[in-house]
Amino acid sequence: MRMLIDTQALIWYVDQDHLLTPVAHTAITDPANDLLLSAATVWELAIKVGQRKLSLSLPYRQWMDKAIADLGLILLPVTIEYADRQTALPAHHKDPFDRLIIAQALVEGIPLVSSDEKLDFYGIQRLW
């Protein structure tokens, strides 16, 4: 199954695995799943690390390269279609990175691995 992993779930999987639910852990680690990673997540993490708002277990580039390699993550780029879709989303969620990830999940018709209950307002299948 194809699915998208959100930023927090990725951080927890790599650095604080014990915070994941069994459902989320299985979704992330099941080799039968194709796990997509939004370019929005890559950018969000870089910004937060650069602003010293987030500390990772390795330097950013090493951390990201290792996460992508270890999980076999498939990068999902930002496209005009995704950007356009997020313009029509209700304002339940204000974070621009999360709004783009929501739009990507909706356009692709895939579940999202996330602890964020606000996502339930968007009709996304949330795995947690």
Specify the residue positions occupied by each region the protein language model found.
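Active-site neighborhoods of divalent-metal-dependent phosphate/nucleic-acid chemistry enzymes
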Residues: 55-61, 69-115, 127
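Generic structural signal for small/hydrophobic residues in well-ordered secondary structure
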Residues: 7-8, 45, 86, 105
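Alpha-helix capping/helix-boundary segments
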Residues: 9, 41-42, 82, 101, ...
